[in-house]
């Protein structure tokens, strides 16, 4: 009976808890996807804007001839000054840019704040990263100005078209870390960005920068998306991976957003519901067991009283706890026993009176007989 009553409640409770957990997980996953798309969109806006602005600076016939100049005449000097002015204006008006430099191996051009002559680029990190590509994004090692602490800087590297086989020119644009942070960090989620699926170039926790990003087991590179639980730092977290293909380059940005509290909240809610279900099952069960034991005790008491009455023992209990059908039955039994007891008492009283009457009659007969006997006869 208990199992029959509890089993439906148990099934409904388990189904409800599973449904609530599924809905909460789907809701958090939806929020995580939205935040991942927001971060990817912000990163795309920054990188696309920087790349498009560099197009405006470089896509001109002046750059073709300027960096191929064999001498510094007045015309070349004017072009060089105009380009330097354009670079300075762009640097001052673009908050996302931390530095902008053009490196060339043309010795005929004068050095300026943003244009530098360099005889060889082979050993430079940015040149190694560019390789044979015309443009690429890279995470380059930089140092703070005062204490010389190292940090990684997201950098656009572009090869500049030069109308000469002897000379080369390259544009290097470093992005400002604070600007990137202000655009990306707009929620409580932890954000991590990897360039081409290798080292982390940006992270909410700066300790992770430079380390390899952790991917799920099914990660195979290129365009990748995943939303769900994953172990991060020896803890299960709700994560979202989204891939951003950079504008006019072959780079892929892998954006990972992590909600550190989602699974904790879900598990806590499920635990509360499980506790409620256990209480909903346990409290009625305890009450039913107590009531059943109480009811069984009263049944046993009533049965014992009826059994004693059936054997002619009418000395049963006077009180019977409760106010239900069993109490009414006991009252009826008590009335019946009392009635039988009264009848028996009346019967025995009648028998006694009858016996007393017989005794009285016998005494009278004896007295009459005694009065008829001659005393002299008795004497003789």
Please give the residue ranges for each predicted region.
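Extreme N-terminal signal-anchor transmembrane helix of membrane signaling/transducer proteins, especially
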Residues: 1-22, 26
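Cytosolic-side ends of inner-membrane transmembrane helices, especially those
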Residues: 13, 17-18, 276-296, 310, ...
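Extracellular/periplasmic ligand-binding regions of membrane signal-transduction receptors
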Residues: 33, 48-82, 100-116
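Extracytoplasmic/periplasmic ligand-binding sensor regions of membrane-associated signaling proteins
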Residues: 77, 81, 89-175, 180-183
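Membrane-proximal, non-catalytic sensory/regulatory domains of signal-transducing membrane proteins
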Residues: 127-162, 213-251
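Short, hydrophobic beta-strand elements of compact beta-sandwich sensory domains
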Residues: 155, 167-177, 234-271, 275
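Membrane-proximal alpha-helical signal-transduction linkers
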Residues: 287, 291-321, 330, 334-337
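Conserved signal-transmission helix
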Residues: 331-371
């Amino acid at each position: 009976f208990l199992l029959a009553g509890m089993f439906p409640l148990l099934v409904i409770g388990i189904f409800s808890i599973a449904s609530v957990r599924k809905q909460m997980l789907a809701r958090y996953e939806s929020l995580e996807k939205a935040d991942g798309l927001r971060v990817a969109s912000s990163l795309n806006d920054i990188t696309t804007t920087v790349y498009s602005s560099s197009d405006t600076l470089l896509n001109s016939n002046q750059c073709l001839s300027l960096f191929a100049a064999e001498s510094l005449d007045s015309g070349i000097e004017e072009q060089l000054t105009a380009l330097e002015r354009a670079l300075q204006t762009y640097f001052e008006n673009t908050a996302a840019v931390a530095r902008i430099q053009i490196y060339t191996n043309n010795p005929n051009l004068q050095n300026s704040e943003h244009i530098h002559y360099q005889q060889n680029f082979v050993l430079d990190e940015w040149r190694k990263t560019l390789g044979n590509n015309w443009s690429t994004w890279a995470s380059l090692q930089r140092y703070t100005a005062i204490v010389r602490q190292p940090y990684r800087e997201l950098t656009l590297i572009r090869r500049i078209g030069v109308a000469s086989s002897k000379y080369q020119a390259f544009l290097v644009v470093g992005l400002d870390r604070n600007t990137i942070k202000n655009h990306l960090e707009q929620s409580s989620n932890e954000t991590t960005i990897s360039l081409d699926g290798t080292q982390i170039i940006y992270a909410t926790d700066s300790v992770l920068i430079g380390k390899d990003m952790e991917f799920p087991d099914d990660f195979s590179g290129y365009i990748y998306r995943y939303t769900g639980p994953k172990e991060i730092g020896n803890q299960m977290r709700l994560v979202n991976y989204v891939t951003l293909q950079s504008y006019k380059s072959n780079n892929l940005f892998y954006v990972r957003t992590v909600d550190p509290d989602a699974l904790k909240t879900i598990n806590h809610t499920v635990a509360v519901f499980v506790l409620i279900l256990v209480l909903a099952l346990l409290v009625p069960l305890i009450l039913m067991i107590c009531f059943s034991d109480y009811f069984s005790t009263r049944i046993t008491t009533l049965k014992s009283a009826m059994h004693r009455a059936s054997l002619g023992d009418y000395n049963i209990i006077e009180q019977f706890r409760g106010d239900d059908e069993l109490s009414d039955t006991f009252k009826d039994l008590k009335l019946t026993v009392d009635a039988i007891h009264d009848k028996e008492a009346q019967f025995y009283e009648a028998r006694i009176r009858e016996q007393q009457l017989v005794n009285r009659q016998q005494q009278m007969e004896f007295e009459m007989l005694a009065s008829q006997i001659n005393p002299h006869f008795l004497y003789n």
